């Protein structure tokens, strides 16, 4: 019975170590989650900038069309 307890405790510690520090463990998940959050914020900024550029292009095209109509 004592050997079984030692084996089960060893297994538990090994599984916990793998969960927290192993490949694709909790620490890797936290790192990736932070990167994704940063990239989402960056994408929001780029979307806003793209929308501003689209508005500038539309305004430019409207001014060109007005000038063509005047002539």
Curated annotation (Swiss-Prot):
Extracellular side: 22-71
Domain of life assignment: Bacteria
Keywords noted in UniProt: Cell cycle, Cell division, Cell membrane, Membrane, Transmembrane, Transmembrane helix
An individual GO BP term: FtsZ-dependent cytokinesis
GO cellular component labels: cell division site; cell septum; plasma membrane
Membrane topology of the entry: Single-pass type II membrane protein
Subcellular localization, as worded in the UniProt entry: Cell membrane
Annotated transmembrane regions: 4-21
Chief subcellular location: membrane
First and last residue of the signal peptide: none
Cytoplasmic side: 1-3
Stated family: Belongs to the FtsB family.
Function field: Essential cell division protein. May link together the upstream cell division proteins, which are predominantly cytoplasmic, with the downstream cell division proteins, which are predominantly extracellular.
PANTHER family on file: CELL DIVISION PROTEIN FTSB
Protein name: Cell division protein FtsB
Organism expressing this protein natively: Buchnera aphidicola subsp. Acyrthosiphon pisum (strain APS) (Acyrthosiphon pisum symbiotic bacterium)
Gene coding for it: ftsB
């Amino acid at each position: 019975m004592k050997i079984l307890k030692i084996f089960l405790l060893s297994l538990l510690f090994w599984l916990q170590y793998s969960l927290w520090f192993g490949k694709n463990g909790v620490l890797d998940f936290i790192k990736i989650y932070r990167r994704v959050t940063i990239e989402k914020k960056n994408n929001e900024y780029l979307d806003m900038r793209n929308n501003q550029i689209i508005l500038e292009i539309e305004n430019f095209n409207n001014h060109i069309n007005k000038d063509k109509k005047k002539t």
